Amino acid sequence: MADTWTQWLAEPAPSPTQAYTRCTNLATPAACNWLVPVTSGQAPHTLCQACRLNRTIPDLNDPVHPDNGVLWGRIELAKRRLFSSLLALGLPVASLTEDPVHGISFDLLRSPDAGPPVMTGHKAGLITLNLLEADDAVREALRSALREPYRTLLGHFRHEIGHYYWDRLVSGTVWMQGFHQLFGDETQDYAACLQKNYLQDPPAQWWLHYVSAYASTHPWEDWAECWAHYLHMRDTIDTAVSLGLATDSVHLEFIAFTLDALYQPDHPEAQTFLDFLNDWTRLTTLLNEMSRSMGQPDFYPFVLPHEVVAKLHFIHLLVTSGSWLQQGDAPMTEQVELQTQSQNQSQNQSQSQL
Protein backbone atom coordinates (compact mmCIF):
# COMPACT_ATOMS: atom_id res chain seq x y z
CA MET A 1 0.00 0.00 0.00
CA ALA A 2 1.19 3.51 -0.78
CA ASP A 3 1.63 6.36 1.68
CA THR A 4 -1.15 5.83 4.22
CA TRP A 5 -1.84 9.55 4.34
CA THR A 6 -2.65 9.85 0.66
CA GLN A 7 -3.75 6.50 -0.69
CA TRP A 8 -5.68 3.40 0.39
CA LEU A 9 -6.80 0.15 -1.14
CA ALA A 10 -10.31 -1.16 -0.72
CA GLU A 11 -10.80 -4.33 1.31
CA PRO A 12 -9.97 -7.51 -0.65
CA ALA A 13 -12.75 -8.48 -3.03
CA PRO A 14 -13.19 -10.84 -5.99
CA SER A 15 -12.97 -7.91 -8.40
CA PRO A 16 -9.79 -5.83 -8.87
CA THR A 17 -9.01 -3.74 -5.81
CA GLN A 18 -9.90 -0.05 -6.06
CA ALA A 19 -7.35 2.47 -4.83
CA TYR A 20 -8.34 5.80 -3.29
CA THR A 21 -6.59 9.00 -2.37
CA ARG A 22 -7.61 11.84 -0.08
CA CYS A 23 -9.30 14.94 -1.42
CA THR A 24 -6.72 17.72 -1.42
CA ASN A 25 -9.20 20.00 0.32
CA LEU A 26 -8.46 18.06 3.51
CA ALA A 27 -5.52 20.43 4.00
CA THR A 28 -7.64 23.57 3.49
CA PRO A 29 -10.26 25.19 5.73
CA ALA A 30 -12.82 23.02 3.92
CA ALA A 31 -11.35 20.06 5.88
CA CYS A 32 -12.86 17.63 3.37
CA ASN A 33 -12.74 13.99 4.51
CA TRP A 34 -13.96 12.39 1.27
CA LEU A 35 -11.84 10.06 -0.86
CA VAL A 36 -11.15 10.08 -4.59
CA PRO A 37 -10.92 6.90 -6.70
CA VAL A 38 -7.56 6.37 -8.41
CA THR A 39 -7.78 4.75 -11.85
CA SER A 40 -4.68 3.18 -13.33
CA GLY A 41 -3.49 4.88 -16.50
CA GLN A 42 -5.59 8.01 -15.93
CA ALA A 43 -4.61 11.34 -14.43
CA PRO A 44 -6.23 11.28 -10.97
CA HIS A 45 -8.65 13.89 -9.74
CA THR A 46 -7.20 15.85 -6.86
CA LEU A 47 -10.60 16.93 -5.55
CA CYS A 48 -13.51 14.71 -4.55
CA GLN A 49 -16.84 14.73 -6.32
CA ALA A 50 -18.32 17.33 -3.96
CA CYS A 51 -15.37 19.71 -4.03
CA ARG A 52 -15.02 19.50 -7.83
CA LEU A 53 -18.36 21.27 -8.12
CA ASN A 54 -16.97 24.59 -6.85
CA ARG A 55 -16.43 27.23 -9.51
CA THR A 56 -15.58 30.03 -7.07
CA ILE A 57 -14.51 29.87 -3.43
CA PRO A 58 -13.79 32.75 -1.02
CA ASP A 59 -10.42 34.48 -0.97
CA LEU A 60 -8.61 32.67 1.84
CA ASN A 61 -5.84 35.30 1.93
CA ASP A 62 -8.10 38.34 2.30
CA PRO A 63 -6.60 40.40 5.17
CA VAL A 64 -9.84 42.35 5.56
CA HIS A 65 -11.91 39.20 6.07
CA PRO A 66 -9.77 36.66 7.95
CA ASP A 67 -12.89 34.64 8.77
CA ASN A 68 -13.40 33.62 5.14
CA GLY A 69 -11.78 30.25 5.76
CA VAL A 70 -13.94 29.44 8.79
CA LEU A 71 -17.13 30.40 6.98
CA TRP A 72 -16.13 28.42 3.90
CA GLY A 73 -15.46 25.36 6.04
CA ARG A 74 -18.99 25.50 7.44
CA ILE A 75 -20.45 25.80 3.95
CA GLU A 76 -18.45 22.83 2.64
CA LEU A 77 -19.57 20.68 5.57
CA ALA A 78 -23.20 21.36 4.67
CA LYS A 79 -22.52 20.82 0.97
CA ARG A 80 -20.96 17.42 1.60
CA ARG A 81 -24.01 16.43 3.61
CA LEU A 82 -26.21 17.47 0.71
CA PHE A 83 -24.29 15.45 -1.85
CA SER A 84 -24.00 12.37 0.33
CA SER A 85 -27.81 12.32 0.30
CA LEU A 86 -28.09 12.94 -3.44
CA LEU A 87 -25.61 10.19 -4.25
CA ALA A 88 -27.32 7.74 -1.91
CA LEU A 89 -30.61 8.47 -3.69
CA GLY A 90 -28.94 7.74 -7.03
CA LEU A 91 -29.69 11.19 -8.43
CA PRO A 92 -27.58 12.49 -11.33
CA VAL A 93 -24.68 14.56 -10.02
CA ALA A 94 -21.91 15.93 -12.24
CA SER A 95 -19.83 19.08 -12.46
CA LEU A 96 -20.10 21.47 -15.39
CA THR A 97 -16.70 20.22 -16.52
CA GLU A 98 -17.95 16.64 -16.62
CA ASP A 99 -21.33 17.55 -18.12
CA PRO A 100 -21.39 21.01 -19.78
CA VAL A 101 -25.12 20.68 -20.51
CA HIS A 102 -26.54 19.34 -17.24
CA GLY A 103 -23.71 19.88 -14.75
CA ILE A 104 -23.77 21.67 -11.39
CA SER A 105 -21.40 24.36 -10.15
CA PHE A 106 -21.16 26.60 -7.10
CA ASP A 107 -20.11 30.20 -6.58
CA LEU A 108 -19.48 30.77 -2.86
CA LEU A 109 -19.20 34.55 -2.66
CA ARG A 110 -18.91 37.17 0.05
CA SER A 111 -20.91 40.35 -0.29
CA PRO A 112 -18.68 43.40 -0.79
CA ASP A 113 -18.53 45.67 2.25
CA ALA A 114 -19.67 48.70 0.24
CA GLY A 115 -21.71 47.06 -2.47
CA PRO A 116 -24.92 45.17 -3.12
CA PRO A 117 -25.31 41.88 -1.24
CA VAL A 118 -24.69 38.57 -2.94
CA MET A 119 -28.05 36.93 -3.58
CA THR A 120 -28.34 33.21 -2.92
CA GLY A 121 -30.00 31.50 -5.87
CA HIS A 122 -29.84 29.15 -8.85
CA LYS A 123 -29.56 29.70 -12.58
CA ALA A 124 -28.93 27.02 -15.21
CA GLY A 125 -26.99 24.70 -12.92
CA LEU A 126 -25.02 27.46 -11.16
CA ILE A 127 -25.85 27.78 -7.47
CA THR A 128 -24.69 30.95 -5.73
CA LEU A 129 -24.49 31.13 -1.94
CA ASN A 130 -23.70 34.20 0.12
CA LEU A 131 -20.74 33.32 2.34
CA LEU A 132 -22.22 35.33 5.22
CA GLU A 133 -25.01 32.78 5.53
CA ALA A 134 -22.36 30.74 7.38
CA ASP A 135 -22.12 33.47 10.04
CA ASP A 136 -24.60 32.35 12.70
CA ALA A 137 -25.40 35.89 13.87
CA VAL A 138 -26.01 37.17 10.35
CA ARG A 139 -28.12 34.19 9.37
CA GLU A 140 -30.22 34.36 12.54
CA ALA A 141 -30.82 38.08 12.04
CA LEU A 142 -32.05 37.38 8.51
CA ARG A 143 -34.24 34.53 9.72
CA SER A 144 -35.86 36.79 12.29
CA ALA A 145 -36.29 39.71 9.87
CA LEU A 146 -37.94 37.44 7.29
CA ARG A 147 -40.07 35.74 9.96
CA GLU A 148 -38.80 32.32 9.02
CA PRO A 149 -39.04 29.40 11.47
CA TYR A 150 -35.92 27.74 10.05
CA ARG A 151 -32.84 28.93 8.17
CA THR A 152 -29.70 26.79 7.81
CA LEU A 153 -26.90 26.28 5.33
CA LEU A 154 -28.10 22.76 4.59
CA GLY A 155 -31.61 24.09 4.08
CA HIS A 156 -30.30 26.62 1.56
CA PHE A 157 -28.44 23.94 -0.36
CA ARG A 158 -31.39 21.55 -0.42
CA HIS A 159 -33.69 24.33 -1.62
CA GLU A 160 -31.40 25.57 -4.40
CA ILE A 161 -30.59 22.07 -5.63
CA GLY A 162 -34.35 21.61 -5.89
CA HIS A 163 -34.42 24.34 -8.53
CA TYR A 164 -31.64 22.52 -10.38
CA TYR A 165 -33.51 19.22 -10.35
CA TRP A 166 -36.71 20.90 -11.56
CA ASP A 167 -34.79 22.01 -14.65
CA ARG A 168 -33.03 18.67 -14.86
CA LEU A 169 -35.80 16.14 -14.19
CA VAL A 170 -39.18 17.86 -14.56
CA SER A 171 -39.10 20.61 -17.18
CA GLY A 172 -40.18 19.34 -20.58
CA THR A 173 -40.90 15.80 -19.35
CA VAL A 174 -44.01 13.70 -18.70
CA TRP A 175 -43.83 14.89 -15.09
CA MET A 176 -45.03 18.37 -16.08
CA GLN A 177 -48.69 17.36 -15.98
CA GLY A 178 -48.44 16.29 -12.35
CA PHE A 179 -46.40 19.38 -11.54
CA HIS A 180 -49.08 21.67 -12.93
CA GLN A 181 -51.78 19.77 -11.08
CA LEU A 182 -50.03 20.12 -7.72
CA PHE A 183 -47.85 23.23 -7.90
CA GLY A 184 -49.51 25.41 -10.53
CA ASP A 185 -48.45 27.40 -13.59
CA GLU A 186 -44.73 28.16 -13.54
CA THR A 187 -45.04 30.58 -16.49
CA GLN A 188 -46.42 33.38 -14.31
CA ASP A 189 -43.97 36.27 -13.90
CA TYR A 190 -41.35 35.02 -11.45
CA ALA A 191 -39.75 38.40 -10.70
CA ALA A 192 -43.13 40.00 -10.08
CA CYS A 193 -44.10 37.18 -7.72
CA LEU A 194 -40.89 37.61 -5.73
CA GLN A 195 -41.43 41.36 -5.50
CA LYS A 196 -44.98 40.80 -4.30
CA ASN A 197 -43.71 38.37 -1.67
CA TYR A 198 -41.41 40.97 -0.14
CA LEU A 199 -43.98 43.78 -0.26
CA GLN A 200 -47.08 41.95 0.93
CA ASP A 201 -48.04 39.39 3.52
CA PRO A 202 -48.42 35.78 2.34
CA PRO A 203 -51.91 34.58 1.35
CA ALA A 204 -54.44 34.07 4.12
CA GLN A 205 -54.20 30.60 5.64
CA TRP A 206 -51.25 29.71 3.45
CA TRP A 207 -50.41 26.90 5.90
CA LEU A 208 -53.34 24.89 4.56
CA HIS A 209 -51.68 24.66 1.14
CA TYR A 210 -47.91 25.17 1.54
CA VAL A 211 -45.06 23.90 3.68
CA SER A 212 -43.84 27.47 4.26
CA ALA A 213 -44.96 31.02 3.57
CA TYR A 214 -42.18 31.40 1.01
CA ALA A 215 -43.51 28.39 -0.90
CA SER A 216 -46.63 30.43 -1.71
CA THR A 217 -44.54 32.90 -3.74
CA HIS A 218 -44.39 30.98 -7.04
CA PRO A 219 -44.73 27.35 -8.20
CA TRP A 220 -40.95 27.11 -8.61
CA GLU A 221 -40.46 28.14 -4.98
CA ASP A 222 -43.19 25.76 -3.84
CA TRP A 223 -41.35 22.96 -5.64
CA ALA A 224 -37.95 23.90 -4.19
CA GLU A 225 -39.33 24.14 -0.66
CA CYS A 226 -41.03 20.75 -0.94
CA TRP A 227 -37.90 19.24 -2.48
CA ALA A 228 -35.83 20.51 0.46
CA HIS A 229 -38.29 19.00 2.93
CA TYR A 230 -38.23 15.68 1.11
CA LEU A 231 -34.44 15.62 1.52
CA HIS A 232 -34.82 16.60 5.19
CA MET A 233 -37.10 13.62 5.66
CA ARG A 234 -34.98 11.10 3.79
CA ASP A 235 -31.71 12.06 5.46
CA THR A 236 -33.13 12.29 8.98
CA ILE A 237 -34.96 8.98 8.74
CA ASP A 238 -31.82 7.35 7.37
CA THR A 239 -29.75 8.72 10.25
CA ALA A 240 -32.30 7.57 12.82
CA VAL A 241 -32.34 4.06 11.36
CA SER A 242 -28.54 3.94 11.15
CA LEU A 243 -28.28 4.82 14.84
CA GLY A 244 -30.96 2.38 15.91
CA LEU A 245 -33.38 5.07 17.08
CA ALA A 246 -36.88 3.60 17.43
CA THR A 247 -40.18 5.31 18.23
CA ASP A 248 -42.53 2.34 18.03
CA SER A 249 -42.14 1.60 21.75
CA VAL A 250 -43.15 5.13 22.76
CA HIS A 251 -46.72 6.40 22.94
CA LEU A 252 -46.90 9.54 20.83
CA GLU A 253 -50.12 11.37 20.20
CA PHE A 254 -50.46 12.33 16.56
CA ILE A 255 -52.97 11.88 13.77
CA ALA A 256 -51.59 9.46 11.19
CA PHE A 257 -51.94 10.26 7.51
CA THR A 258 -54.04 7.96 5.35
CA LEU A 259 -53.73 6.95 1.71
CA ASP A 260 -56.18 9.58 0.53
CA ALA A 261 -53.58 12.28 1.30
CA LEU A 262 -51.16 10.95 -1.32
CA TYR A 263 -50.76 12.10 -4.91
CA GLN A 264 -51.45 8.61 -6.25
CA PRO A 265 -53.16 6.62 -3.46
CA ASP A 266 -53.56 3.63 -5.79
CA HIS A 267 -49.87 3.47 -6.69
CA PRO A 268 -48.39 -0.01 -5.97
CA GLU A 269 -45.88 1.54 -3.55
CA ALA A 270 -48.31 4.02 -1.96
CA GLN A 271 -48.41 2.19 1.37
CA THR A 272 -44.62 2.17 1.52
CA PHE A 273 -44.49 5.95 1.23
CA LEU A 274 -47.37 6.34 3.68
CA ASP A 275 -45.50 4.28 6.28
CA PHE A 276 -42.41 6.41 5.68
CA LEU A 277 -44.47 9.58 6.10
CA ASN A 278 -46.02 8.45 9.37
CA ASP A 279 -42.61 7.32 10.62
CA TRP A 280 -41.44 10.87 9.93
CA THR A 281 -44.38 12.33 11.86
CA ARG A 282 -43.64 10.12 14.87
CA LEU A 283 -39.93 10.89 14.74
CA THR A 284 -40.35 14.67 14.52
CA THR A 285 -42.92 14.62 17.32
CA LEU A 286 -40.31 12.91 19.48
CA LEU A 287 -37.45 15.17 18.41
CA ASN A 288 -39.50 18.34 18.91
CA GLU A 289 -40.13 17.28 22.51
CA MET A 290 -36.43 16.56 22.95
CA SER A 291 -35.56 20.03 21.66
CA ARG A 292 -38.07 21.66 24.00
CA SER A 293 -36.59 19.79 26.95
CA MET A 294 -33.34 21.66 26.27
CA GLY A 295 -35.02 25.02 25.74
CA GLN A 296 -34.24 24.93 22.03
CA PRO A 297 -36.50 25.70 19.05
CA ASP A 298 -38.43 22.79 17.62
CA PHE A 299 -36.32 20.36 15.61
CA TYR A 300 -38.93 20.48 12.82
CA PRO A 301 -41.09 23.61 13.15
CA PHE A 302 -43.44 22.74 10.30
CA VAL A 303 -46.84 21.18 9.77
CA LEU A 304 -47.56 19.12 6.66
CA PRO A 305 -51.07 19.76 5.29
CA HIS A 306 -52.59 17.21 2.93
CA GLU A 307 -51.75 19.28 -0.16
CA VAL A 308 -48.08 19.27 0.80
CA VAL A 309 -48.17 15.53 1.47
CA ALA A 310 -49.39 15.01 -2.09
CA LYS A 311 -46.52 17.16 -3.38
CA LEU A 312 -44.00 15.19 -1.34
CA HIS A 313 -45.39 11.94 -2.72
CA PHE A 314 -45.04 13.31 -6.25
CA ILE A 315 -41.39 14.16 -5.58
CA HIS A 316 -40.83 10.71 -4.09
CA LEU A 317 -42.26 9.04 -7.20
CA LEU A 318 -39.98 11.13 -9.39
CA VAL A 319 -36.86 10.43 -7.32
CA THR A 320 -37.48 6.69 -7.13
CA SER A 321 -38.55 6.32 -10.77
CA GLY A 322 -35.11 6.67 -12.33
CA SER A 323 -36.92 8.22 -15.29
CA TRP A 324 -33.89 10.37 -16.19
CA LEU A 325 -32.02 7.17 -17.06
CA GLN A 326 -34.22 6.93 -20.16
CA GLN A 327 -32.47 10.07 -21.36
CA GLY A 328 -29.14 8.23 -21.37
CA ASP A 329 -27.83 9.66 -18.13
CA ALA A 330 -26.44 7.28 -15.53
CA PRO A 331 -26.47 8.58 -11.93
CA MET A 332 -23.03 9.34 -10.56
CA THR A 333 -22.48 6.83 -7.76
CA GLU A 334 -18.71 6.58 -7.45
CA GLN A 335 -18.67 8.20 -4.01
CA VAL A 336 -21.62 6.49 -2.34
CA GLU A 337 -19.57 4.05 -0.30
CA LEU A 338 -17.02 6.71 0.61
CA GLN A 339 -19.31 9.02 2.54
CA THR A 340 -18.75 9.35 6.25
CA GLN A 341 -22.48 9.37 6.95
CA SER A 342 -24.44 6.14 6.80
CA GLN A 343 -26.70 6.68 3.82
CA ASN A 344 -27.32 3.14 2.66
CA GLN A 345 -30.36 2.13 4.70
CA SER A 346 -33.42 1.38 2.63
CA GLN A 347 -36.79 2.99 3.11
CA ASN A 348 -38.29 -0.36 4.04
CA GLN A 349 -35.81 -0.66 6.90
CA SER A 350 -37.00 2.67 8.26
CA GLN A 351 -40.54 1.38 8.43
CA SER A 352 -39.58 -1.66 10.47
CA GLN A 353 -37.37 0.15 12.97
CA LEU A 354 -39.03 3.51 13.64
What are the roles of these predicted feature ranges?
Residues S216-E337, L354:
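Pan-zinc metallopeptidase signature
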Residues Q335-Q353:
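Compositionally biased, intrinsically disordered low-complexity segments enriched
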Residues Y20, T24, P66-D136:
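Auxiliary, metal-adjacent structural segments of Zn-dependent hydrolase domains
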Residues L129-E140, A192-W206, A261:
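Active-site-adjacent bridging/hinge elements
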Residues A137-F157:
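Short pre-active-site segment immediately N-terminal to the catalytic Zn-binding motif
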Residues R151-S171, A224:
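Active-site recognition of the HExxH zinc-binding catalytic motif
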Residues M1-H65:
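Cys/His-rich short segments
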Residues D167-E221, W227-T236:
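Post-HExxH zinc-binding segment in Zn-dependent metallohydrolases
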